[in-house]
Amino acid sequence: MDSEKILNPRLVSINSTSRKGMSVELPQKPPPPPSLLDRFKALLNQREDEFGGGEEVLPPSMDEIVQLYEVVLGELTFNSKPIITDLTIIAGEQREHGEGIANAICTRILEAPVEQKLPSLYLLDSIVKNIGRDYGRYFSSRLPEVFCLAYRQAHPSLHPSMRHLFGTWSSVFPPPVLRKIDMQLQLSSAANQSSVGASEPSQPTRGIHVNPKYLRRLEPSAAENNLRGINSSARVYGQNSLGGYNDFEDQLESPSSLSSTPDGFTRRSNDGANPSNQAFNYGMGRATSRDDEHMEWRRKENLGQGNDHERPRALIDAYGVDTSKHVTINKPIRDMNGMHSKMVTPWQNTEEEEFDWEDMSPTLDRSRAGEFLRSSVPALGSVRARPRVGNTSDFHLDSDIKNGVSHQLRENWSLSQNYPHTSNRVDTRAGKDLKVLASSVGLVSSNSEFGAPPFDSIQDVNSRFGRALPDGTWPHLSARGPNSLPVPSAHLHHLANPGNAMSNRLQGKPLYRPENQVSQSHLNDMTQQNQMLVNYLPSSSAMAPRPMQSLLTHVSHGYPPHGSTIRPSLSIQGGEAMHPLSSGVLSQIGASNQPPGGAFSGLIGSLMAQGLISLNNQPAGQGPLGLEFDADMLKIRNESAISALYGDLPRQCTTCGLRFKCQEEHSKHMDWHVTKNRMSKNHKQNPSRKWFVSASMWLSGAEALGAEAVPGFLPTEPTTEKKDDEDMAVPADEDQTSCALCGEPFEDFYSDETEEWMYKGAVYMNAPEESTTDMDKSQLGPIVHAKCRPESNGGDMEEGSQRKKMRS
């Protein structure tokens, strides 16, 4: 009986050698359910046992393999990454029976329910991209029929995912097959319509974290990829394919399993590869081959601006994601900041990530996912070099996004000091040009405020500004990181038209309050420097003019102008003078190789593309009215004030006259009125005093003596108010629903004042005259109608009874 006892599970961890004398056997933990790969092997072993008996067992035929594969294929009833992984491995091991397996998968897609078609298509996609070879030819014969039927039967919410899946097949299936599908389903036109209709890109689906012990990264080095390049890529039907996915049989080495069990499934490797990288990693993270990056540059030149043609392994991350809840909206490919597509490279998918880089930067979210400008990497925040274990020739950057503008700028400055070999490229990073432009307008108060290098170093950095910019274009604003300084459109208006009146205005009125005085010479220098910068702007600017003194006036009063966005960290604090752009830096910019007009044209064009500048002519806003009283100023009609008080608040309360801007605020206000009116109606208030007093009362009141500051005009004898029985109420009691005297039920109602249910016209029988708040319920007696209470209980009914009215 001792062997049948159930012990505490904590004892399982005790070493068995420490309990030799114990006769109790600990219960064993049930083994996990076998995977599909193990089940398939078990079915093969069962077949061998059935045909055993000492004779040589013949290898299974194609029909038998297909029959066993259909058994495990029936488990793919939902979008599961482990199931797709095992089915892909089985298909890779049984490549000699690939034609039958492909037909079984196509039949499964045609006959499966609607909700199970997309997981089967993902299985087809995984087999073609990871194994390739003959499977592409087997599936091509039935792909138009299978995909078109599944697309027509699928729910409309799954159509974007299926179009995205179709867009990744440009390198694994023949073009005639894809054109046939496109003609039948009109996928190109549907993708363009969805791209135009989507104002904002949808939130990208998150990848599924995989335990690193299941990952073996066998990524070839960059030098080896350059050598085999196109030779290993040209595989499928005379068109260039991505190397490393269709040459599955050419680079077989030691077998390994994704589930860490020896299953015989081979994996591609390379002698000089780093063990921390992987090439065959379908659906298990975000690793891609270097061939993807190489082919991505070339394919973007030929495939236009649609989202229908993506790299073959771009959809691997979708396996195991519920596409009915996460629908990807196809969006047009926009090269980052208008720069050439060869300058961008999909780098973020080369390592396993537990978050999406698109979530961290709005610029990345608006641009092509998986692409990034190399020149803007150091501006993303804290960037530190991480040495690699194997091949150390490649320099990888591990970027961690930090919060706060000042902290990011300090990290960038420390990077330029710690890594001298990258400091030559820092001067062209996005954000430096914006800092130069912003400082000329007066947005940056001091460099030490953000932990930036001294202003002399900025001049040294910008001395190479002209020759560092490629093709004579100014770095675009969308290439900046989170630490760059935005330039609002209102400030560009000030730069475009400073006006001649600014000098006169500066001579007449100070820029700051008296406690924050700035020297007149400093203001004049800043005016001259701003005028020098305006000379570089194109004369044919279509922006609406806005005077410079408008910005200066708003700053002098301590608030930003309407329509402009000035960060709080960039505001002028405690009398710190604005640091204008020195004339030396302007001369260095003017002496650069690039044409000045083209540089600022590119900057303005980028601002217009990002929506920061509009071509619509905006009316010039009026200046502040000031704080000094002037009778003549009151006679002038101020349209801005009238609009702010009336025009901008179209909704008005008919009861009290208050105005509101939106319907929600107006509705809340009306609800408040209804509550107040209901409370006033239920609670009858007495007047504070009588209207008039007689002459005798007036005279007697004037001669009255006492400590009161004002004589009392009302009679001194107390007057008892006549109260109605209907005004009395007590809280409802579930234990007593009828009068204790007459037996009739009480009339209950909900009181808005007390926010509880009350009995109307009811009182406590034994309630005293004083307050009953601290008294026990048993002392008050039963609840009775006020009209039923006997008058003999304590004298007169109105005087001797405590009538509980509705509490306010």
UniProtKB/Swiss-Prot annotation:
UniProt entry keywords in alphabetical sequence: Cytoplasm, Flowering, Metal-binding, mRNA processing, Nucleus, Zinc, Zinc-finger
Please describe the organ and tissue distribution of this protein's expression: Expressed in embryos, seedlings, roots, leaves and flowers.
Q: Where is the stretch described as Disordered?
A: 1-32, 192-212, 246-293, 785-808
Question: What CDD domains does the entry give?
Answer: CID_Pcf11 (cd16982)
User: Where does it mainly reside?
Assistant: nucleus
User: Which GO CC annotations does the UniProt entry carry?
Assistant: cytoplasm; nucleus
Compositional bias ranges of the Polar residues kind: 196-205, 253-263, 271-280
| GO BP annotation list | flower development; mRNA 3'-end processing; mRNA processing; positive regulation of flower development; termination of RNA polymerase II transcription
Highest taxon, organism lineage: Eukaryota
Do you know which SUPFAM superfamilies this protein is assigned to? ENTH/VHS domain (SSF48464)
Q: Where in the cell is it found?
A: Nucleus; Cytoplasm
Q: Which Gene3D superfamilies match?
A: 1.25.40.90
- A Pfam family of the record is zf_PCFS4
Query: What residue stretches are annotated with the CID domain?
Result: 61-189
Single Gene Ontology MF annotation = zinc ion binding
Q: When the coding gene is removed by deletion, what phenotypic consequences does the entry describe?
A: Delayed flowering mediated by FLC under both long-day and short-day conditions, but normal response to vernalization treatment. Abnormal alternative polyadenylation-dependent FCA expression profile of the known transcripts. Global differentially processed (DPG) and differentially expressed (DEG) stress-associated genes due to alternative polyadenylation, splicing or transcription initiation.
**Subunit field text:** Homodimer. Forms a complex with cleavage and polyadenylation specificity factor (CPSF) subunits CPSF30, CLPS3 and PCFS1.
Record's function text: Promotes flowering by suppressing FLC-mediated inhibition of flowering through the regulation of FCA pre-mRNA alternative processing. Regulates mRNA maturation including alternative polyadenylation, splicing or transcription initiation of stress-associated genes.
Tell me the protein's name: Polyadenylation and cleavage factor homolog 4
* Organism, scientific name: Arabidopsis thaliana
